Design a protein with these regions (language model features):
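Nucleotide-activated donor-binding/catalytic signature segment of Leloir-type glycosyltransferases, i.e.
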Residues: 236-252
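A charged, aromatic-enriched C-terminal amphipathic alpha-helix characteristic of glycosyltransferases
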Residues: 313-316, 327-359
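A short, active-site helix/loop in glycosyltransferases that binds the activated sugar's phosphate group
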Residues: 143-169
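Short alpha-helical donor nucleotide-sugar binding micro-motif in glycosyltransferases
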Residues: 251-252, 259-264
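Aromatic "clamp/platform" in nucleotide-sugar-dependent glycosyltransferases that forms part
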Residues: 272
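Short His-centered aromatic/hydrophobic patch
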Residues: 90-96, 116
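A conserved mid-protein helix/loop that constitutes part of the nucleotide-sugar donor-binding site
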Residues: 19-30, 194-213, 230-233
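Membrane-proximal helix-turn-helix segments that form the acceptor-binding/catalytic region
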Residues: 29, 130-148
Length: 359
């Protein structure tokens, strides 16, 4: 089996809470152990800027200093055993990838993997200078990369078209979600939720119009917004006259979000494009109806789960679907069917990820 090393020079810049990130890697490792039948498999995480208060007993983690040179030397040290076959996974920022490229250099025993967690279509069509520079760097780097992980079939297709010269492996393995095992008999609520970053690219500007239309037909509906971002202040101002007053929680850890799902009856997503739709799937496995803007990903999800998810093309349509779901109940047998379908899909992707790392 190959040695697997994940390197990120600054996890404080990652949108995911570090505790959730560590938990995610622990789940990856457990899935690999189960699939490969090897309880002795290890993951080696080299992480910079990780808070000293964070503990990690279940997985092997090396804290890195702030010095980029020290980080590079620590990474080289972890790769120095002669003849050892290594899979080196670069964190999803420029510096992490650059340091990994230097560490790999001309070593043929190191397989370098990168992950693209964002929409490939968005990545390939940047709207600002920062995005254009990021795209340029990635396109220059892929010639030195062996594997690329993306999160959806559409991303796989778009990336293959963009880098026809790439002769490595591109595969699909989205971030897995936690699928509850307990039976769920949901209580009816009047809460419409949004979960995710409050950024322009998430279609936040459309939300007030939807909320206004919903308030006309269902004045007692409540709004819960979980997440933070550049548009939060604007959205709070636009919704300041709403009664009941919308609740803004800010960013929450995954464990805290899980505690909130039972409150929410319908999840709204206004994102014009979705790479995988992680929050949409989390809602569905927790018995929450979903109303989402029409795009390639949401259309596929609606086709898979037509009785519990609807896609919209304008605010009026969204409000109609939301109001309709408020009249319905997400029955236990529906939840079981959704969970089974998503788990089957997820297990297939975890096996693919385990193969790319350890085999």
């Amino acid at each position: 089996m190959r040695k697997v090393v994940f390197f990120h020079n600054n996890v404080s810049r990652v949108a995911t809470d570090p505790r959730d990130l560590l938990s995610r890697f622990h789940n990856y490792l457990q899935a690999a152990k189960d699939y490969l039948g090897n309880p002795n498999l290890e993951l080696n995480l080299l992480l910079g800027r990780i808070d000293s208060s964070i503990r990690f007993d279940a997985i092997k983690v090396v804290r890195l200093s702030r010095s980029l040179l020290s980080q590079y030397l620590a990474l080289r040290s972890s790769l120095k055993r002669p003849g050892e076959q290594v899979t080196l996974i670069a964190g999803d920022n420029h510096l992490s990838l650059l340091i990994c490229l230097f560490a790999k250099a001309r070593k043929t025993n190191i397989r370098l993997q990168i992950s693209i967690h964002t929409s490939v279509n968005t990545l390939l069509n940047p709207s600002n200078i920062s995005g254009k520079l990021k795209l340029k760097f990635i396109l220059l780097s892929v010639g030195f990369v062996d594997n690329i992980r993306v999160v959806s079939d559409s991303d796989l297709e778009n990336l293959r078209k963009a880098i026809t010269y790439f002769d490595g492996q591109i595969f699909v393995a989205p971030v897995p979600i936690e699928i509850p095992k307990a039976a769920l008999d949901r209580k009816h609520s009047h809460v419409l939720g949004m979960v995710g970053r409050l950024h322009p690219e998430r279609g936040v500007a459309e939300c007030p119009a939807i909320f206004e239309e919903l308030r006309v037909v269902r004045p007692k509906s409540e709004i819960l917004l979980i997440g933070d971002g550049a548009e939060r202040a604007w959205l709070e101002k636009k919704l300041s006259g709403f009664e009941p007053r919308p609740e803004f929680t800010g960013s929450l850890k995954q464990s805290d979000i899980r505690d909130r799902w039972p409150q929410i009856h319908v999840l709204l997503s206004c994102a014009p494009s979705e790479s995988y739709g992680m929050a949409l799937r989390e809602a569905l496995v927790n018995g929450v109806f979903v109303v989402a803007r029409k795009n390639k990903t949401t259309e596929l999800l609606q086709a898979q789960f037509p009785s519990v998810m609807k896609v919209f093309t304008n605010p009026s349509e969204a409000a109609i679907f939301i109001n309709s779901f408020f009249e319905q109940k997400f029955f236990p047998d529906m939840i079981i069917a959704v969970r089974q379908a998503i788990k089957s899909e997820q297990d297939k992707h975890l096996i693919q990820l385990a193969k790319s790392w350890f085999v």
